[in-house]
Amino acid sequence: DGPAIIGAAWFAPTGAPIDPGAARRFVHAGQTVGWVIPAGERWDGPHTKGPELAIEGVLLRGTFDLLTALEELLPADCADFLAAPNDGVPVGSVVLGDPTHLVSLGANVEPGVVFDLRNGAVVLDQGAEVRNGTRLEGPVYVGPGTRILGGFIRASVFGSECRVRGEVAASVFLGFANKSHDGFVGHSVIGPWVNLGAGTTTSNLKNTYGQVRLEVDGQRIDTGRLNVGSLIGDHAKTAIGTMLATGTVVSVGANVFGTPMPPKYVPPFAWGCAGSERMTEDGFLRIAERVMSRRNVTFSAERRESLRRTFARSTRR
């Protein structure tokens, strides 16, 4: 029952929420991307017909389109925090640009951090930590409990409880992702519980300056983008010194080691890159439980079952 807004997972809307006061089907570029249900009405959809309302946003054809959404949405998303009560400029910080574009919501910032706010706001959420030796160039969002351990960070977003060091540009880190050492990550999407070994580096631009194509399980996908780094699935891991080519896809649960430069497509739950060896389900679950316990996250029966289903679905062939 309403009121409710139901959105397609493959569409990122822009602007303020819309309440047309009546049931409507949201449409973007000729496609149905959501529905709004007023209070007191029941939704029996999804429907592809009915009264429609045009809405602006970004269609997500695949994970790589999160990079386009990041470019288009992050500046405004960070700016939305500017009116919130916050801690102001931390003592000992160096600020380039308008200091009101730095929003600290209970973060811990060591002296000597550089905030470059000339191209966008920097938002540090509750419990975030930024160490000395860090330069943050907005727009940047640092999620609750995330630690920025040093380096140059620009135009990126980090979910909760990430660990980040080195150079990161125009990238999305989902929650609990770990990059605690030096190395460059650019125009990449890093899934939850990923661990990037020391020195892991992504290429985000072809030497030909041509558009990037992905190779996914035998299929080639045109991204239409000049800059695409790596798309790394949940719980994947890379060995120290790993070099990832432009447009590399590392699938869920894969453990990348055995070669400095892995192939551009690493299948789900791969164990190394030398052949077709795959992790066992029990082996994967044991590792996931160890990793989560280090972050004080309970490996519940529900979480275990969810990962079992993910393993089964991803390894059917």
Residue positions per predicted region:
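Terminal amphipathic alpha-helical/low-complexity segments used for targeting or macromolecular assembly
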Residues: 1-100, 259-264, 268-317
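Conserved active-site and cofactor/substrate-binding residues in soluble primary-metabolism enzymes
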Residues: 61, 119, 137, 189, ...
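Beta-strand-rich solenoid/repeat architectures in extracellular/passenger domains
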Residues: 86-88, 109, 202
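Short Cys/His-rich Zn2+-coordinating modules
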Residues: 88, 128, 175-176
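Right-handed parallel beta-helix
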Residues: 96, 108-151, 156
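Cysteine-centered iron-sulfur cluster-binding motifs in ferredoxin-type domains/subunits
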Residues: 97-102, 187-190
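Glycine-rich hexapeptide-repeat left-handed beta-helix
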Residues: 144, 149-152, 158-316
